[in-house]
């Protein structure tokens, strides 16, 4: 990994918005950041190297004070069954370098459709029957597009956790996803460049948002 201090004002503004979304709702940095930076002309690899360190850091900050509130059963399920999906999906992207803009658009549209009650109930029933396969598919979609978050939220929501366990468990799985993606990127590309400025900026925004909620 190579660390730099370069930054861009527009990028800082975008990162502020998506970091606030992540701190409030548990998703945002990858869900919104990925399509935004692709639309701005960044490659998928460049988008990953920008967003993954930030996502992992914010997830870590979310779970450190609440380690005891991570549901270990769910975390271990994702550790067992989603890693292969991420490995396959991300390696397909890195090796064949397809244009994923259409795929990202389809997944975002499908994420909106998850809000439809009838469709959501059908998916819930399918998940109960094919849970391991569903978790693998979440990993595969995340590896291909960086947008496994909505399905992750859907899967964890089936457990009817209270708010803190729900958010902390999602953050722990997001951290797991990001670490695996960064490892794959490092091995496939040889190095990735991480801007310390963006990294620290996201941390400041997270703490400011967290402080505002406390006050």
Model-identified regions with their sequence ranges:
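Short, well-ordered alpha-helical segments in soluble proteins
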Residues: 110-120, 144, 148, 160
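Short, strongly hydrophobic alpha-helical membrane anchors
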Residues: 1-9
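Hydrophobic, well-ordered secondary-structure segments
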Residues: 100, 106-110, 130-138, 149, ...
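Membrane-interface helix termini and inter-helical loops of multi-pass transporters
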Residues: 1-2, 32, 90-98, 122-124, ...
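Membrane helix-loop-helix hairpins that form the core translocation module of multi-pass transporters
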Residues: 45-117
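Small-residue-mediated transmembrane helix hinge/kink sites in multi-pass secondary transporters
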Residues: 89-94, 154, 213-214
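Alpha-helical multi-pass membrane helix bundles of inner-membrane/thylakoid proteins
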Residues: 114-138
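Small-residue-rich hydrophobic segments that form or flank transmembrane alpha-helices
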Residues: 8-76, 135, 139, 143, ...
């Amino acid at each position: 990994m190579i660390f730099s201090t370069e930054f861009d004002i527009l990028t800082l503004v975008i990162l502020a918005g998506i970091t606030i979304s992540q701190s409030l709702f548990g998703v945002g940095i990858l869900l919104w950041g990925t399509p935004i930076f692709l639309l701005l002309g960044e490659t998928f690899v460049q988008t990953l190297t920008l967003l993954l360190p930030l996502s992992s850091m914010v997830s870590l900050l979310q779970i450190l004070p609440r380690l005891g509130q991570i549901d270990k059963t769910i975390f271990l399920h994702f550790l067992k069954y989603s890693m292969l999906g991420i490995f396959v999906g991300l390696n397909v992207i890195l090796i064949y370098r397809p244009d994923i803009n259409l795929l990202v658009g389809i997944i975002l549209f499908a994420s909106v459709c998850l809000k439809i009650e009838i469709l959501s109930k059908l998916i819930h029933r399918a998940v109960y029957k094919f849970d391991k396969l569903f978790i693998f598919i979440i990993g595969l979609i995340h590896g291909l597009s960086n947008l496994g978050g909505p399905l992750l939220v859907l899967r964890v929501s089936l457990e009817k956790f209270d708010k803190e366990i729900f958010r902390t468990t999602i953050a722990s799985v997001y951290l797991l996803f990001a670490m695996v993606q960064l490892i794959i990127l490092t091995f496939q590309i040889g190095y990735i460049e991480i801007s310390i400025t963006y990294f620290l900026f996201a941390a400041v925004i997270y703490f400011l948002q967290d402080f505002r909620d406390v006050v």
